[in-house]
Amino acid sequence: MSAGISHVPAAQVSQHVTVLLEEAVEALSIKPDGVYVDGTFGRGGHSRKILEKLGAQGRLVALDRDLAAIQAAQGIQDARFKIVHSHFAAMAQVLASLNIQQVDGVLLDLGISSPQIDEGERGFSFRFDGPLDMRMDQSRGQTAAEFIATATEQELTRVIKEYGEERFAKQIARAIVAQRAGGMDISTTGQLAKIVAGAVPKVEPGQDPATRTFQALRIFINQELEELSLTLPQCLSLLAPQGRLAVISFHSLEDRIVKRFIRGEQDRDNLPAHFPVRASDLPQPRLVAIGRAVRPSEDEVRRNPRSRSAVLRVAERTAVL
């Protein structure tokens, strides 16, 4: 096990603080009788706030692929609320099964929750030694340990570089393969963190050398960017006119996808200025960005340091088909 790996009981550290709570829910411009989707229930901070603003005829459907989140949702006894064990890329299918064709707002909080980070047995963090799992949904799919055990050096390099934006990806991949060749079964977060620390020649101030590698593996194992890319067009199709899409991202890879999607739907008439066509014949925007990207206040970052990289983008559905 690497130095610095903590064995603090999860119960002592896993309190989740919802990021941009007021800002995200306000951005949805809740209608009392509206239908809303919380695509990432987590520990329910956003869902509870939405329910506070809904009237008796309102409705909220929440999704999460983490079984611990589904269990946490059982504490909400409200006829207006429905929790579904599902990844948000299946949103359209889930809503269809509930006979919901249109919604007035969708919220996606793409961040990993504090309990997921702080519970060592989940395998998300280099701070707490535990099985190298990293699956959001522990009932299915390949674990990080299984991927590391079989991936080639080239595959490891690609994943760590592409999803972690790690400049030392090649050195880290080489070190993993070398340890594997030497007979090591890399099955814990502590083992991996130690290998990465030994492979990285230069560490950014204030950042653990394993940060980017753990991010990369988590994103890859859970197909987070692919899920997001599949989900955004569904949100567009599901939103009623004047419906709102609010997305909180936590790193540039996610934010880039969200930003490009909104911009692509807003700037559909991106033809050359003197192109011979009437303005009325140009494709009209189906989404319009609402305000600028919102970031946590200094006070929120002080209270919850994990919020510091959060970015909230909001867009509104137009009446254009």
Swiss-Prot record:
Keyword Cytoplasm: yes
Pfam families in UniProt: Methyltransf_5
Entry annotated with the keyword S-adenosyl-L-methionine: yes
Major location (coarse): cytoplasm
GO biological process: rRNA base methylation
One Gene Ontology molecular-function label: rRNA (cytosine-N4-)-methyltransferase activity
Binding of S-adenosyl-L-methionine, residues: G44, G45, H46, D64, F88, D109, Q116
Alphabetized HAMAP family for the sequence: 16SrRNA_methyltr_H
Function in brief: Specifically methylates the N4 position of cytidine in position 1402 (C1402) of 16S rRNA.
Protein name in the entry: Ribosomal RNA small subunit methyltransferase H
Species annotation: Methylobacillus flagellatus (strain ATCC 51484 / DSM 6875 / VKM B-1610 / KT)
Phylogenetic lineage: Bacteria, Pseudomonadati, Pseudomonadota, Betaproteobacteria, Nitrosomonadales
Gene name as annotated: rsmH
